[in-house]
Amino acid sequence: MARLKITQTKSYIGSKQNHRDTLRSLGLKRLNDSVVKEDRPEFRGMVQTVRHLVTVEEVD
């Protein structure tokens, strides 16, 4: 199964509370933090919510 590497590229300062909560749920705590998650609809939806704060790469 494919995996996603999610990297926080922008600060959440000034963002809405639900965006901060989504970043925390993804496991991103600070700028340039990266996590690798399974490519599942749940994670895709979370990434879509904070797409302006993160970058996503597919990893094998």
Swiss-Prot record:
Keyword Nucleotide-binding recorded: no
Family, as annotated: Belongs to the universal ribosomal protein uL30 family.
NCBIfam families: rpmD_bact
Keywords tagged on the record: Ribonucleoprotein, Ribosomal protein
Molecular function in Gene Ontology: structural constituent of ribosome
GO cellular component: cytosolic large ribosomal subunit
Gene Ontology biological process: translation
Species annotation: Streptomyces filamentosus (Streptomyces roseosporus)
Pfam families: Ribosomal_L30
Ranges in a coiled coil: none
Protein name listed in UniProt: Large ribosomal subunit protein uL30
Subunit structure of this chain's protein: Part of the 50S ribosomal subunit.
Listed HAMAP family: Ribosomal_uL30_B (MF_01371_B)
Keyword Mitochondrion: no
